[in-house]
């Protein structure tokens, strides 16, 4: 559901529930927030290099050049499930159910998709196999 229409805030930090977040991420959250507001951008996705992922099966979502995200045939960075977004990027969405990939692709096409690299280990509860490896 598109909750942006019913909210009053301009900027949002969102966290996916299937990533194992811990206190080591606090520094990265703070750095992301500082970068986001200092550079007056409208989106910032936390990404990690594939070799920092507990689940080695991830193929990669993006590549990162400076702080710009883009997609190629082979991608070396994984989206962690954390992003800071400004409500303005949702203005053209006229439906209640949509995929964030639609917005990311649009921003990427305009070369306005930004990323921030985390140096933390990325643990995503992909499936029961990964869950069992953690225990």
Description of each model-found segment:
Residues 1-11:
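Active-site nucleotide-sugar/metal-binding loop of Leloir-type enzymes
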Residues 3, 60, 130-132:
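Short low-complexity, flexible loop/linker segments enriched in glycine and/or proline
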Residues 9, 40-41:
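Short, high-confidence coil segments that cap the C-terminus of an alpha-helix
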Residues 12-13, 20-33, 37, 50-54, ...:
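Catalytic-core segments of class I nucleotidyltransferases/pyrophosphorylases
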Residues 43-61:
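Short beta-strand-to-loop element that shapes/binds the nucleotide-sugar donor at the catalytic cleft/hinge
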């Amino acid at each position: 559901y598109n909750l942006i229409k019913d909210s009053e805030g301009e900027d949002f930090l969102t966290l996916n529930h299937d990533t194992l977040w811990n206190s080591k991420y606090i520094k990265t959250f703070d750095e992301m927030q500082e970068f986001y507001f200092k550079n007056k951008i409208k989106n910032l996705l936390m990404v990690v290099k594939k070799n920092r992922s507990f689940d080695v099966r991830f193929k990669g979502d993006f590549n990162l050049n400076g702080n710009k995200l883009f997609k190629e045939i082979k991608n070396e960075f994984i989206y962690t499930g954390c992003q800071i977004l400004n409500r303005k990027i949702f203005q053209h969405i006229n439906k209640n159910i949509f995929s964030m990939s639609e917005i990311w692709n649009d921003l990427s096409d305009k070369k306005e998709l930004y990323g921030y690299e985390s140096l933390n280990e990325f643990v995503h509860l992909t499936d029961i196999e990964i869950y069992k490896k953690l225990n």
